[in-house]
């Protein structure tokens, strides 16, 4: 399984954009990954990863190999020490369901907190 993430978002020097993936096994145990993205110009970011492939192949702790996997993801800006500086709006989650042989491309836009979110 390969996931391709692309997003256009301008950051300040020293800031990095990350994509956070999260989900859970059928038994309720949760998993998550914080993956740094790469950029050549500080504005166009990308990441190709196979990190979720292990959830299809492994039988860790007696878990059965799964045919389908559901996960959510969002983006955040971090400094060089890993402190979160900005996080996109996550009230409406980005969710995906996929198979082990999936090759998915996510061409996203940053989702700011709406001005009326406090209402």
List the predicted regions and their residue ranges:
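Compositionally biased low-complexity segments at domain edges in trafficked proteins
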Residues: 102-119
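Aromatic-rich carbohydrate-binding modules that target alpha-glucans
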Residues: 10-68, 76-102
């Amino acid at each position: 399984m390969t996931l391709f993430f692309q997003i256009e978002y301008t950051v300040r020097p020293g800031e990095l954009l990350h994509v956070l993936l999260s989900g859970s096994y059928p038994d309720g145990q949760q998993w998550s990954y914080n993956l740094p993205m790469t950029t050549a110009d500080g504005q166009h970011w990308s990441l190709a990863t196979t990190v979720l492939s292990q959830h299809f192949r492994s039988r860790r702790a007696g878990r059965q190999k799964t045919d389908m996997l559901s996960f959510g993801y969002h983006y955040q800006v971090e400094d060089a020490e890993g402190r979160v500086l900005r996080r996109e709006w996550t009230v409406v989650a980005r969710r995906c369901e996929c198979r082990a042989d999936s090759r998915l491309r996510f061409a996203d836009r940053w989702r700011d907190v709406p001005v009326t979110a406090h209402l």
